Amino acid sequence: MKEFKSFYKEVKGNEGSKCLYNKRLDTYGCGCQHDCSYCYAKSLLDFRKLWNAKTPAVASLDRIEKKIERLPVGTVVRLGGMTDCFQPIEKQERVTRGTIMLLNKYGIHYLIVTKSDLIVEYMDILDKELAHIQISTTWIPAEKAVSTERRIQAIETLYDAGFDVSVRLSPYIPQYVDFERLNSIRCNKIIVEFLRVNHWIRKWLPLDYSEYTLKQSGYCHLPLVKKIEYLAMVTGFEELSVCEDVDAHYLYWKDIVNHNKEDCCNLRMKEE
């Protein structure tokens, strides 16, 4: 199995300036077995022949520990920034499980972003003060991740157990959402991220892109007025936030919409 050596990154630029948690740790890289048609990481790596969905590279736990032990206590690390840390390969490699145990050991917060319900099997090691979980819900056809219903069940299981968990509607494509089911999920928090489109995503994902008329940083986006219209269809959550890439839209959500104006991920953080 090929080793994934560039497992840690501090995100810079446009994305890094907007995201409060720009430290990213990927336990698997250069491919993801979910192989989503709308994945921006895939769109960046596939044309360079660096994307291998069937056999992702695997990070070394020894190298991961050397990085984690140097991080200040209270740091928040995002698990699953470029690839899903709970993709099927985790069942055999268990690098994510080992990484979580190391993060617990060194007192490092971790933000898990996943499309898998495998995380429920790890509830025995998740630290309720350090673990922050976002499970992505999508109803896009032919996805290779587990069914949306299984993901919803995982959200509700974690929520009922008292974990800091959010529904992550990412990407939010209204044409592919079961709003009745979405708005009935037993969870108090949701994070919405609208689709951003480039050439490769147009090629892979069948969709009417005529509304994606706003261009920024190499991507096409919905205009703000359309985003506001579609966001009104998301109801039933006490705390709503929008994860945004477009500069002017980011300021609008921050000032007008987001539950936590300083943290669009809206993590439940205790005072250190």
Residue ranges, per PLM feature:
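A broad, structural surface signal
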Residues: H34-S37, M101, M233
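The N-terminal extracellular segments of secreted preproproteins, especially immediately downstream
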Residues: K18, G31, R186, D263-C264
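N-terminal [4Fe-4S]-dependent radical SAM core
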Residues: M1-K67, P72-V76
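Conserved AdoMet/S-adenosylmethionine-binding subsite of the radical SAM
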Residues: I64-L231
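C-terminal accessory extensions appended to soluble enzyme cores
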Residues: N198-E272
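Short linear sequence elements within intrinsically disordered, low-complexity coil regions
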Residues: S43, V177, D255-N258
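Pocket-edge structural micro-motifs
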Residues: G29, Y40, G80-G81, I135, ...
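Compositionally biased, intrinsically disordered low-complexity regions enriched in proline and serine
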Residues: K9, C39-A41, M123, D160, ...
